Amino acid sequence: MSNARNKRNNKNEEQGLEAGLLDRVVKIKRCAAVVKGGRRFSFAAMVVVGNGSGQVGWGYGKANEVPPSVQKAQKQASRSMIHVPLVEGSIPHQVWGRYGAARVVLIPAGAGTGIIAGQAVRAVCEACGIHDILTKSYGTNNPVTLVKATLDAMSKLRTREQIAALRGLNPDDLIEA
């Protein structure tokens, strides 16, 4: 078992990922440029990276082959990570996020619910370490904008203690809505 884990960690280190980071490839697209000799293809990859305990980021990489584009995206994602507060495997409160035409609502769920989400939003939640959440996306179904809208929503999350500190109150004095 540990041998398999070491192989996986070595693979992550070769790709430029730190040990302990989870990555999910959300989208790979192929672009064709027409040149005199025919078509020249290039690839773009969208990757979500997280540590499974509240850190998550996204990256977008382009190259002439798929593996280098994924590696570039992983490197960019590991540099753009944000912290997401987690409460018992879920999020502290309901929150909306938006990016372009994408609208995403994230709703906390009880233990055992699982991740109820589309493919792009699910990748972000899994990389972040969320186990129980309800989500709904509105507007576009473009995975790139859905990931950005999800991360916008996650950046707005605050714990009870953070809200109390902003208001200059004791966390016990806050009234649940």
Swiss-Prot record:
A single cellular component GO annotation: cytosolic small ribosomal subunit
Alphabetical UniProt keywords: Ribonucleoprotein, Ribosomal protein, RNA-binding, rRNA-binding
MF-aspect GO terms: rRNA binding; structural constituent of ribosome
Taxonomy of the source species: Bacteria, Pseudomonadati, Planctomycetota, Planctomycetia, Pirellulales
Main function: With S4 and S12 plays an important role in translational accuracy.
Limits of the S5 DRBM domain: 21-84
Organism domain of life: Bacteria
Name of the protein in question: Small ribosomal subunit protein uS5
Domain remarks in the Swiss-Prot or TrEMBL record: The N-terminal domain interacts with the head of the 30S subunit; the C-terminal domain interacts with the body and contacts protein S4. The interaction surface between S4 and S5 is involved in control of translational fidelity.
Homology family: Belongs to the universal ribosomal protein uS5 family.
The protein's assembly and partners: Part of the 30S ribosomal subunit. Contacts proteins S4 and S8.
BP terms from Gene Ontology: translation
Pfam families: Ribosomal_S5 (PF00333), Ribosomal_S5_C (PF03719)
NCBIfam families registered for this protein in UniProt: rpsE_bact (TIGR01021)
InterPro entries: Ribosomal_Su5_D2-typ_SF, Ribosomal_uS5, Ribosomal_uS5_bac-type, Ribosomal_uS5_C, Ribosomal_uS5_N, Ribosomal_uS5_N_CS, Ribsml_uS5_D2-typ_fold_subgr
